[in-house]
Amino acid sequence: MIEWICATCTFNESRALQYLQERQGIRDPLALSVVMANIKQESNFTPNICEGGARVEYQDCHVGGYGLIQWTSESRYVGLGIFSAKYGLNPSTFDAQLRYMSNEYQFQRALLDWQIPGRTYEEYHAAAYRWLGWGIEGPRKTYTYNYLDRLSKVSDEKVQSTSSDQKRLGYLEKILGVIGIKV
C-alpha cells in the first residue's frame, strides 16, 4: 500500500519510494526519507554509475563501488551479478539493483528498524549505516529532511502535502485566482 508520494521526485526516486512501501513495508515518512537519502548520496539514483562518476555497464566497473548503493566489497559486487543472472536480469538496470539491494542480508537487517514507525532520525540513520557502512557521510541528513519535506500523504479524498513550498504555491494560486489570473 502506498501512503506517501513525492510529486517533485525524479522517475527513479518515485519508483524507489513506491517499492520501499509496497514491497518492503516501510511506512514511516522519516524512515523512507532516510533510505532515499542514502541512495541519493551513493548514486543519485543512477544504476549504471561506477565510483567516480563513470557511466558504465556492470562488467566494466573495475574500481570502487558500482550502482545504486555503490556495492564496493567483492562479495556484494559479485552478488549483484549472480543475483541478476539467477533471475534473468541485467545487473546494470535500476530494477535489478533495487531487487538485489532489498534481498541483501545487510538491507534485510536494517529493514527491521525501518519498519518500526515513530523512531528518531538517529535510529533510522544508524540502521542505514549498518546497511551501507559508508566511508563519507556527506549530506545524508540534509537529503533526508529534503525528502521528508517533499513527501505528501495520500488519503482517500485528497493528497495532503507536507511541503511548505507546495502550501505557498496553493496560496499564490488562490490570490491570482481572486484577481482573475488563471494558473
What are these regions (language model features)?
Residues 1-36, 54-55, 145-183:
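Extracellular cell-wall/glycan-interacting regions and their flexible linkers
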Residues 2-19, 40-119:
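Peptidoglycan-targeting cell-wall enzymes and recognition modules
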Residues 16, 76-84, 110-112, 127-128, ...:
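Generic structural signal of hydrophobic/aromatic residues within well-ordered alpha-helices
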Residues 24, 51-52, 78, 87, ...:
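Feature targets compositionally biased, intrinsically disordered low-complexity regions
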Residues 31-35, 68, 97-98, 124:
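Short runs of predominantly hydrophobic/aromatic residues within well-ordered alpha helices
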Residues 37-41, 52, 130, 134:
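Short acidic/histidine-centered micro-motifs embedded in hydrophobic/aromatic stretches
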Residues 55-56, 67-70, 82-84, 136-141, ...:
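Polar low-complexity intrinsically disordered regions enriched in Ser/Thr and small residues
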Residues 93-163:
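A charged, amphipathic interaction segment
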